[in-house]
């Protein structure tokens, strides 16, 4: 819902205004009602005594808008959709009006009005709550200074020219309000207008359109007329007004009766257009609330929802059609389905548009087939006059109430001025390549493009303010208008339609336009290369204009591109040109693989790009004939540097924890940027680095498929854009969208695109990984078909697929059994455009699939700009919202590597790890006090450890005093041929009893592995839990995380609270360490030592047994209890645990009943037994410093050393006690826990 409060001032008294407005309403009703397709029916006009405002006049009217809707559209819609109902309660000086449509249930306009004798200074006339006051927008209408549309202007209705003969008033000057406030009379109409159109995809656009055109423009002209007609009403009384109203009602009834009995010719040959207030004039006969009525014929809210028929709606007359199959019944079925989709889901979950989203002025064109985002402007208003009025988005005049938010124009200037000398407040710049959808028939107007950007900006601001406050004021948006390359192709294809001769035919609205052919024809044109060069030039101009603006002074942040349906195609080829021309480190041979001949396959000779080598691909130069005839106008390419509304302006916070990946994704540009070139050239490129490229429903996949068809030897991966990552966002029902991933790896056609989480449910994401490596690992069976996969029978091995073969059972998995098995995975990683998935599917109502295909591109194109799902997704990719966490050690710490990045020791390393993510891990180490302390880790890259880090330096850091959060560098090791390293802690630096976070940082790229070093006393008691055997309530091979058994966390916490060391064991391979620890953290399991199998093995139970044996024999732990599955009974028996110490979860097995205790009643009943004291015993020995307790998921204090009597049970004297008096073990004073963050160089 969009709420605006209008203040309308007039130099007259309240009594005069009441007569003036009522006279104006009845007069306009007479003049502008022409019949059934354009007219008003007055159903009721009677007084009331107990209603809104007390006693007053009630009116009920029906507006007929059929003549203002295209003929093919009228044929589809039932009659009920061509009517708008108005109910009005007039208790002057208070009035209330409500507009509804019987066909669109979730559409409404509510208007409340107070008429007061003041100058509009009262801040809260309607007693709004704090939330409503923050949401509303104030807008003052000036009948003199605000311009009207050119088609509505009349000199006799201009207050600057009008002079009343009878009263002597006028003409009015520009400062008339100040003069009237001093001399009087002066009155103000306070109008609170609430517009709601809660249907998917178009909510913000339609609500803003109704406000700007349907309400403001109508009210402005109506009040100008009320002033300029005063010679006609000044001598009338209220009795005269009531008589005129009755006469008008009879006349309108006769006129409508004639139309109902006459022919239907009015639809085929509609009468002359009445003026804009045709319906508003008759909207309130007997009611001074008339000017808020729906807008005029060509700019009306009813026309807007008529044209926006693809938004959900429901016909109240659907039963009339029965079972007959007709255009009307078909349309009703579609509307009912999409409306039902809206009703079955809560409003918080279904609608992408949010309260307070705003847009600039826009008007729908006349035909759905010509309806596009470039034409949402007033058909009568010129751009110059639209800019001159404060109403089309002039926030400086409308500011948000109560000073909660200053006008954006002044806010941007002030903020930039304050920061100019220090640092740029903007950390992320989005350049929006806006060309429209493939059905746009022309370039449209710049204001309509700006309106889409403003809608997106409002969505950014709303989402950022609620869920990403650290980014508020640090994100800017800039518009880059792009040529409408599909316009000529659309005009050509439209003329080829079998129904092109019949412009009003119903069949023309059906799917006779081959949408897929439009981008293919457009990109095959000889003019396409010139369009790409134009986009490059305009993008550079927009970027340089931002740098020259106060807001962008000193900008060194990351730059991302956003491309709509057609703009995405142009942006992709612009990035390919940039890669070909070379942009710093991006100008490598692997990226320079796009030539100009590929942009237009029909242009120039077709040849094999691989025959000439990769360098040969960049030799082509654009044809001079493709050059634009003149230079690009600067006003079209560069937005205003000041006062622009397409950036999210906010006063920067004094301290901000948000630092995007600035150093790695962008560079500080020079003050001056190259101007737009006159035409494309071999060196045409973007002047900045691009971190990410977001596509909004772009048919780029079809274009790339065509190029591969024309040049079979060309691989899509060769056309590598000069950006770090591409995000292809689309709706599944969008006929224009296409996937990109199957072009890079054909087997991805069997993998569904990732689903973008709904913002209302998961504003910060649902936790799903976007990394390509994780997808390859999850679907490893598709890419490693040569290996025989089997699922182990042991419950502890439910982690994933294990490979069968003797070589894998003995050799480290760093050396695969067959090199060919991972070659395809490596090939995919090398060819991919980034490190994340590319295709992302957005939510849309299923009922949209039933609509004519030709209407969907317009709807989907408009939906992206207001989608909170899209905005939240983009922000999550740009912002490091969640810092890397030390899952094994509770809390991260402030950390900056002591050694800067160095060149790799081996030249091949840089090539091997390109486009693959790190998968380093280090094993948790448990050491008995006084024994050698040895740390081990393994450094791998890619899914399934396809790349090994060999012969590279790794720095080892240990947090010796966890309370301080300070990392100490202990030494440097070099990885071996298997990517492993072993680091013995020097004896002179051996650590005392406690838990110490460890980090092993790769010197070359500062990726790292984490673990914990646990030093315990001899005889420390421990409890062992098998993760898959005792915790999981469901089986998960490689997919979603398994469920946790009820009460499992409480049982583990009980043992920890009793002072026992917790040991977790699992048969999963160590490559899954991060996922398993994240699962433990998600369910708030207490902290403990976690053990994994060393790589892939066919006998995970044997490795678990060996690990536990080492704890008993080498660490001298005393294991007092073990939990697991029936498979673990033999493992625990080998450790010497008695049946009373072995707990098996699940159904009892008869042959094992004598070897263990089955917890058939679950953990809850077992916990009751534990708490009853049946398994507790008093600690022996004196209290001493021991291990601290904490939880994975709960931030606990990091004082890891506490008194043993409270935390850990140990038997026997410690080493310090054996050696006699001396230096006591290191202890830390209790202190306040720190909330610490992690900051790596690679993330700055």
Curated annotation (Swiss-Prot):
Residues 299-319 have a biased composition (Low complexity). The keyword Calcium applies. SMART domains: DDHD, LNS2. Residues 686-880 form the DDHD domain. Changing residue 389 to A: No detectable effect on phosphorylation. Strongly reduced phosphorylation. Loss of threonine phosphorylation. Keywords: Calcium, Cytoplasm, Endoplasmic reticulum, Golgi apparatus, Lipid droplet, Membrane, Metal-binding, Methylation, Phosphoprotein, Protein transport, Transport. It comes from Homo sapiens. The gene is PITPNM1. It catalyses: a 1,2-diacyl-sn-glycero-3-phospho-(1D-myo-inositol)(in) = a 1,2-diacyl-sn-glycero-3-phospho-(1D-myo-inositol)(out). Belongs to the PtdIns transfer protein family. PI transfer class IIA subfamily. The modification Phosphoserine is found at residues 300, 304, 319, 326, 329, 342, 345-346, 373, 382, 593, 600, 621, 896, 1237. It is found in: Cytoplasm; Golgi apparatus, Golgi stack membrane; Endoplasmic reticulum membrane; Lipid droplet. Catalyzes the transfer of phosphatidylinositol (PI) between membranes. Binds PI, phosphatidylcholine (PC) and phosphatidic acid (PA) with the binding affinity order of PI > PA > PC. Regulates RHOA activity, and plays a role in cytoskeleton remodeling. Necessary for normal completion of cytokinesis. Plays a role in maintaining normal diacylglycerol levels in the Golgi apparatus. Necessary for maintaining the normal structure of the endoplasmic reticulum and the Golgi apparatus. Required for protein export from the endoplasmic reticulum and the Golgi. Binds calcium ions. Interacts with PIK4CA. Interacts with PTK2B via its C-terminus. Interacts with RHOA. Has higher affinity for the inactive, GDP-bound form of RHOA. The CDK1-phosphorylated form interacts with PLK1. Interacts with VAPB. One of its GO terms (biological process) is brain development. Changing residue 896 to A: Reduced phosphorylation. The keyword Calcium applies. The modification Omega-N-methylarginine is found at residues 1211, 1218. Phosphorylated on multiple sites by CDK1 at the onset of mitosis. Phosphorylation facilitates dissociation from the Golgi complex and is required for interaction with PLK1. Phosphorylated on threonine residues upon treatment with oleic acid. This is Membrane-associated phosphatidylinositol transfer protein 1. One of its GO terms (cellular component) is lipid droplet.
């Amino acid at each position: 819902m969009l709420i605006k409060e209008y203040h309308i001032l007039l130099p007259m008294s309240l009594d005069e205004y009441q007569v003036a407005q009522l006279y104006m309403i009845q007069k306009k009703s007479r003049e502008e009602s022409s019949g059934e397709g354009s007219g008003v029916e007055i159903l009721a006009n009677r007084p009331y005594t107990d209603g809104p405002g007390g006693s007053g006049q009630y009116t009920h009217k029906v507006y007929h808008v059929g003549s203002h809707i295209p003929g093919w559209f009228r044929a589809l819609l039932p009659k009920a959709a061509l009517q708008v109902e108005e109910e009005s309660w007039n208790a002057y000086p208070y009035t209330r009006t409500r507009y509804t449509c019987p066909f669109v249930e979730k559409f409404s306009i509510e208007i409340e009005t107070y008429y007061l004798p003041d100058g509009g200074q009262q801040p809260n006339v309607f007693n709004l709550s704090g939330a409503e006051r923050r949401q509303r927008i104030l807008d003052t209408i000036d009948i003199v200074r605000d311009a009207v549309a050119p088609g509505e202007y009349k000199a006799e209705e201009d207050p600057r020219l009008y002079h009343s003969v009878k009263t002597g008033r006028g003409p009015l000057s520009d400062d008339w309000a100040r003069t009237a406030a001093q001399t009087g009379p002066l009155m103000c109409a306070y109008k609170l207008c609430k517009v709601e159109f809660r249907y998917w995809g178009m909510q913000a656009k339609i609500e803003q359109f109704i406000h700007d055109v349907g309400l403001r423009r109508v009210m402005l002209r109506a009040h100008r007329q009320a002033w300029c007609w005063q010679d006609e009403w000044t001598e009338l009384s209220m009795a005269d007004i009531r008589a005129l109203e009755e006469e008008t009602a009879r006349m309108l009834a006769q006129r409508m009766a004639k139309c109902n009995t006459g022919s239907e010719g009015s639809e085929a040959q509609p009468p002359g257009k009445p003026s804009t207030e045709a319906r508003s004039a008759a909207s309130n006969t007997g009611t001074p609330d008339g000017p808020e009525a729906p807008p005029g014929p060509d700019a009306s809210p009813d026309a807007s929802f008529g044209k926006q028929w693809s938004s959900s709606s429901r016909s109240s007359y659907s039963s009339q059609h029965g079972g007959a199959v007709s255009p009307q019944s078909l349309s009703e079925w579609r509307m009912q389905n999409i409306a039902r989709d809206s009703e079955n889901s809560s409003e918080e979950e279904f609608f992408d548009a949010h309260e307070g989203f705003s847009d600039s002025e826009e008007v729908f064109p006349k035909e759905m087939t010509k309806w596009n985002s470039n034409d949402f402007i007033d058909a009568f208003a010129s751009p110059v006059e639209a800019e001159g009025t404060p109403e089309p988005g002039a926030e400086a005049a409308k500011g948000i109430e109560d000073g909660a938010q200053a006008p954006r124009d002044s806010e941007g200037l002030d903020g930039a001025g304050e920061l100019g000398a220090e640092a740029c407040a903007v950390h992320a710049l989005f350049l929006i390549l806006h060309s429209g959808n493939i059905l746009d028939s022309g370039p449209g107007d710049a204001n309509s493009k700006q309106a889409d950007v403003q809608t997106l900006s409002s969505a950014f601001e709303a989402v950022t303010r609620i869920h990403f406050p650290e980014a508020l004021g640090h994100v800017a948006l800039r518009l880059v208008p792009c040529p409408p390359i599909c316009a000529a192709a659309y005009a050509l294809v439209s003329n080829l339609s079998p129904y092109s001769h019949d412009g009003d035919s119903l069949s023309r609205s059906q799917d006779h336009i081959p949408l897929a052919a439009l981008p293919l024809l457009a990109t095959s044109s000889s003019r396409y290369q010139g369009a790409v060069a134009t986009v490059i030039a305009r993008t550079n101009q927009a970027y340089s204009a931002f740098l020259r603006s106060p807001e962008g002074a000193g900008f060194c942040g990351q730059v991302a591109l956003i491309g709509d349906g057609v703009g995405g195609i142009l942006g992709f080829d612009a990035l390919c040109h940039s890669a070909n021309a070379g942009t710093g480190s991006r100008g490598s041979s692997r990226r320079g693989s796009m030539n100009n001949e590929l942009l237009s396959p029909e242009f120039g000779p077709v040849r094999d790009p691989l025959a000439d080598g990769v360098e040969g691909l960049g030799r082509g130069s654009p044809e001079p004939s493709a050059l634009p005839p003149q230079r690009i106008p600067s006003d079209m390419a560069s937005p205003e540097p000041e006062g622009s509304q397409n950036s999210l302006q906010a006063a920067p916070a004094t301290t901000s924890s948000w630092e995007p990946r600035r150093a790695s994704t962008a560079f500080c540009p020079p003050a001056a940027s190259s101007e737009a070139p006159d035409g494309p050239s071999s060196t045409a490129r973007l002047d900045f680095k691009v971190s990410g490229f977001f596509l909004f429903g772009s048919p780029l996949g079809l274009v790339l498929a065509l190029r591969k068809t024309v040049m079979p030897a060309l691989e899509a991966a060769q056309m590598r854009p000069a950006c770090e990552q591409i995000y292809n966002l689309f709706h599944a029902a969008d006929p224009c969208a296409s996937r990109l991933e199957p072009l890079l790896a054909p087997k991805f056609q069997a993998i569904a695109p990732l689903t973008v989480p709904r913002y209302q449910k998961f504003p910060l994401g649902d936790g799903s990984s976007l990394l390509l490596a994780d997808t390859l690992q999850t679907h490893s069976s598709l890419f490693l078909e040569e290996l025989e996969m089997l699922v182990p029978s042991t419950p502890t091995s439910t982690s994933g697929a294990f490979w069968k073969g003797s070589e894998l059972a003995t050799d480290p998995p760093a050396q695969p059994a067959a090199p060919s098995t991972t070659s395809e995975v490596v090939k995919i990683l090398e060819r991919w455009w980034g490190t994340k998935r590319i295709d992302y599917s957005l939510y849309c109502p299923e009922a949209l699939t039933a609509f004519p295909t030709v209407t969907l591109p317009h709807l989907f194109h408009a939906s992206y700009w207001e989608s909170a799902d899209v905005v939240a997704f983009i922000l999550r990719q740009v912002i490091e919202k969640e810092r890397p966490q030390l899952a094994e050690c509770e809390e991260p710490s402030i950390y900056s590597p002591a050694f800067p990045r160095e060149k790799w020791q081996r030249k091949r390393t840089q090539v091997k790890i390109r486009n693959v993510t790190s998968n380093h891990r280090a094993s948790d180490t448990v050491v008995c006090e006084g024994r050698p302390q040895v740390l081990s880790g393994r450094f791998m890259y890619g899914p399934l450890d396809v790349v090994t880090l060999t012969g590279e330096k790794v720095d080892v850091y240990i947090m010796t005093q966890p309370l301080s959060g300070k990392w100490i560098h202990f030494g440097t090791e070099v990885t071996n041929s298997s990517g492993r390293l072993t680091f013995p802690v020097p004896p002179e630096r051996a650590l005392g009893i406690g838990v110490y976070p460890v980090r092993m940082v790769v010197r070359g790229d500062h990726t790292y592995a984490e673990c914990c070093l646990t030093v315990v006393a001899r005889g420390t008691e421990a409890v062992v839990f098998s993760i898959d055997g005792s915790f999981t309530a469901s089986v998960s091979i490689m997919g979603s995380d398994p469920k946790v058994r009820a009460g499992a966390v409480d049982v583990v916490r009980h043992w920890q609270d009793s002072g026992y060391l917790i040991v977790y064991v699992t048969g999963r391979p160590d490559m899954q360490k991060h996922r398993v620890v994240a699962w433990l953290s998600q369910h708030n399991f207490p902290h403990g030592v976690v053990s994994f199998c060393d790589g892939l093995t066919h006998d995970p139970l044997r490795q678990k047994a060996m690990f536990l044996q080492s704890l008993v024999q080498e660490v001298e732990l005393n294991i007092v209890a073990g939990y697991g599955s029936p498979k673990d009974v033999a493992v625990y028996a080998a450790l010497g645990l008695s049946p009373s110490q072995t707990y098996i979860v699940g159904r009892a097995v008869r042959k094992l009943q004598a070897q263990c205790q089955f917890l058939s009643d679950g953990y809850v009943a077992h916990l009751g037994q534990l708490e009853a004291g049946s398994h507790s015993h008093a600690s022996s020995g004196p209290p001493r410093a021991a291990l601290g307790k904490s939880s994975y998921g709960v931030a606990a204090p990091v004082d890891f050393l506490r008194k043993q009597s409270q935390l850990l049970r140990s038997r026997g004297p410690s080493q310090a006690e054996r050696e006699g008096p001396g230096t006591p073990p290191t202890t830390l004073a209790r202190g306040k826990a720190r909330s610490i963050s992690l900051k790596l160089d690679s993330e700055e």
